[in-house]
Design a protein with these regions (language model features):
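Terminal connector regions
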Residues: 139-196
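Asparagine-centered strand-capping/turn motif at beta-strand->loop junctions
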Residues: 88-95
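Bacterial signal peptide processing site
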Residues: 21-24
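Short, solvent-exposed loop/turn segments enriched in Ser/Thr/Gly
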Residues: 79-84, 169-171
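Intrinsically disordered, low-complexity Pro/Gly/Ser/Thr-rich segments with frequent PxxP/GP/PP motifs
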Residues: 107-109, 113-149
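Post-signal-peptide N-terminal segment of Sec-exported extracytoplasmic proteins
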Residues: 40-77
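Bacterial N-terminal signal peptides that target proteins for export
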Residues: 1-8
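C-terminal motif of bacterial Sec signal peptides marking the signal peptidase cleavage site
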Residues: 16-19
Length: 196
């Protein structure tokens, strides 16, 4: 076999494999469109580095924690972190994958964060996966017009401590990479959960 023939065969095989890869990525995008996204929960809530367990209130804080909270109120800084968990259900017979996801989170209608999670996510065929979205914010900066008591109570409401509910809104837009190009889901997917 001539060198030219070998080169052409290698070229055609390589192109064929590349186009198969592109077709596979297109199929994954189609599968992603068929997936459903549902708000699952909020967990791993921390305020000033204090773990807020379910139903915890200010009266559950020890003396050291109360001093830290008083200092934070004086400085008007209340860092809070938590995870928003989303159920992604894949009804397809093959896996659905995303390379990254834009998201917008609101608390009681106020935008907390608008950013991108760059972790790749793979949802196996005919199954569900829970995607945890880490959130970090400062409640004093976010709710600057509110009283200190209302702002502190909001952190505890996230942990389910109050009869007054907190409305958590989430919009997500997943992406998939096709032939090196990032393609976005057609629109943001909106979810909402009232925590009480």
């Amino acid at each position: 076999m001539s060198k030219l023939k070998k080169t052409l065969i290698i070229l055609f095989v390589t192109m064929g494999l590349a186009s198969c890869d592109v077709l596979n990525q297109v199929a994954q995008m189609a599968n992603l469109v068929n997936c459903t996204f549902d708000f699952n929960s909020v967990n791993q809530i921390q305020m000033l580095g204090i773990n807020l367990s379910k139903g915890m209130t200010k009266t559950d804080l020890n003396a050291t924690q109360l001093l830290s909270l008083a200092d934070a109120i004086m400085r008007k800084q209340l860092p809070v972190s938590f995870n928003v968990n989303v159920d992604v259900k894949n009804p397809n017979s093959i896996a659905a994958a995303m390379t990254k996801m834009d998201y917008i989170l609101t608390l009681n209608g106020k935008q907390v964060v608008s950013t991108t999670m760059n972790n790749g996510i793979n949802v196996p065929a005919n199954s569900s996966s829970v995607v945890s979205i880490p959130i970090t914010t400062d409640l004093f900066q976010l709710f600057s017009g509110e009283s200190a008591d209302a702002i502190v109570n909001l952190a505890f409401k996230l942990a389910g401590a109050s009869s007054n509910p907190v409305n958590v809104g989430l919009k997500v837009k997943p992406y998939i990479s096709i032939n090196g190009q990032q393609l976005a889901y057609p629109d943001f997917i909106s979810m909402n959960k009232v925590l009480n």
